[in-house]
A protein has these predicted regions:
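Long, charged all-alpha helical bundle/coiled-coil segments in cytosolic proteins
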Residues: 1-22
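Alpha-helical coupling/stalk and coiled-coil linker elements that connect catalytic or binding modules
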Residues: 12, 16, 32-191
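Extended, EK/Q-rich alpha-helical coiled-coil segments that serve as long dimerization/scaffolding arms
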Residues: 22-33
């Protein structure tokens, strides 16, 4: 699209032998917008990629907040103040946990997910958070599945246009070589 825009804008001032190349380039605005609106980076898919993904991510945020709120009650409770290493909620092995002093680990019923390198802190998922964390894990699995579905759909749509994409690629490659030779000639003052 950028090459086509160049040909129609800055490059369109006068006829050129390159016009034949630019005329061969086609753009598929629908596919382009679909990809750019779905893929934010190599690691991130937009919520707007599908209504299902947006819904799942909304549920993830709600469930995370619910678990944090539940654990917040524990870390602010005076009855647990002496056993906590710090009054914070953290994440270990994709589970919300609280840091408990090693010598007090048996005083908070729950599952141990990690131990600090010094061995002085146990990261425990209180039993009251297990069901919530399980629901959160299921939501993360649903999110991964939906992302895979979206990427498969985009791949299939791209595959439907593979011949034109290949032709455009070949033309753009040729144009890149022409411009590279021109830049080199200009840099060497070999014009």
């Amino acid at each position: 699209r950028q090459a086509k825009s160049y040909a129609e804008g800055e490059g369109a001032q006068e006829a050129s032998v390159l016009d034949l190349y630019f005329q061969q380039i086609t753009s598929n605005k629908y596919l382009e917008e679909r990809i750019f609106n779905s893929i934010l980076s190599k690691d991130e898919i937009a919520d707007a990629a599908s209504s299902e993904l947006a819904s799942i991510r909304r549920k993830i945020r709600q469930q995370s907040a619910k678990i944090r709120e539940s654990l917040q009650k524990i870390i602010t409770s005076t009855s647990y103040a002496k056993i906590l290493q710090e009054p914070i909620v953290t994440i270990r092995s994709d589970r919300f946990v609280v840091p408990v002093k090693a010598e007090c680990k048996g005083q908070l019923p729950g599952l141990v997910h990690d131990v600090s390198s010094s061995g002085s802190t146990y990261f425990i998922e209180p039993m009251s958070a297990v069901n919530g964390n399980n629901e959160l894990r299921e939501l993360f699995m649903a999110e991964r599945k939906e992302i895979e579905r979206i990427l498969a759909e985009l791949s299939a749509e791209s595959a439907d246009h593979r011949e034109q994409i290949k032709l455009d690629y070949d033309v753009l490659l040729e144009l890149e070589c022409i411009f590279a030779r021109a830049r080199l000639s200009f840099a060497m003052r070999a014009i």
